[in-house]
Regions:
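Extended alpha-helical scaffold/tether regions of large eukaryotic proteins
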Residues: 1-267
């Protein structure tokens, strides 16, 4: 074990490494150790290891502005809208044709959800130019370490990056915008449900590869399986691949991502 009490140690450790510009080589070193214990390519960086926790904390610190310019406008739209995905599903009991109304509202639900998922997905895959250089450098390192560990798997270089930038960064920010300072307060129950579905959609679309039957069957909601069949197009996969290529390249984008001095201790 590199660190027995890694959860308490991670945040101050990341702050210290950022302050001394040593985070990238440290993450590379602990990620390599992590990969040595990983037996299957499809489980790369999926656990709560020291490496994954360090990258998580780094993204929260370095990626604040990136999240704001990429997601805040559409998150605000979901939050302020009077017609969020589930808002119209309230009292149906007094309607003369409850089943007919349910069918109509169900179609509206899918329509609205598709609109928001499309918009969030589009904003993300167009955002690579805004991704902080430090995040790109970390992703570049993780990508090549994963490819080295599993040389016969052509997809692992992408899943190594998507497991962070989609699953642990964008999807988490969508479902909990208040914790990333994208919204001032915890969303109400209906908005929260909408954001949860959008987040789940982004996780699925961000997973490298096609939307297989096994992925579709993992949804508890039957309508989500039908919903995702509309995304089974090569253009979505290619958009994700290009985005992952861009954010894991060494080409300079945003100067550093750390616009303010890193505080070694809070309070």
């Amino acid at each position: 074990e590199v660190c027995r009490d890694k959860y308490d140690a991670v945040l101050p450790l990341v702050r210290l490494l950022l302050h001394h510009h040593k985070l990238v080589p440290f993450v590379a070193a602990v990620a390599e150790l992590d990969l040595k214990d990983t037996q299957e390519a499809n489980t790369v960086f999926r656990g709560n290891s020291l490496a994954t926790r360090c990258v998580d904390e780094m993204m929260k610190i370095v990626g604040k502005h990136y999240l704001k310019v990429t997601l805040k406008p559409v998150i605000d739209e979901v939050g302020y809208s009077t017609e969020t995905v589930f808002r119209a599903l309230s009292p149906l009991g007094n309607h003369s044709d409850v089943n007919g109304l349910k069918k109509y509202l169900f179609s509206q639900l899918q329509e609205n959800l598709r609109y928001y998922v499309d918009k969030v997905f589009r904003e993300i895959v167009r955002s690579s130019i805004s991704c902080p250089t430090l995040m790109c450098d970390v992703f570049y390192s993780l990508r090549h370490l994963a490819a080295k560990r599993f040389p016969n798997d052509p997809h692992v270089q992408y899943s190594a990056v998507s497991s962070f930038v989609f699953l642990r960064f964008f999807a988490v920010a969508v479902v909990s915008p208040h914790t990333f300072h994208l919204r001032p307060h915890h969303p109400d129950a209906q908005t929260s449900r909408t954001l949860t579905l959008i987040s789940k959609a982004i996780q699925t679309l961000g997973s490298w590869g096609s939307l297989t039957k096994s992925k579709l069957s993992s949804f508890k909601e039957t309508f989500m399986c039908e919903f995702f069949k509309t995304f089974q197009e090569e253009k979505f996969t290619e958009s994700v691949k290009k985005f992952l290529d861009d954010v894991s390249s060494t080409e300079s984008k945003e100067p550093s991502g750390v616009s303010e001095p890193v505080h070694l201790k809070e309070g």
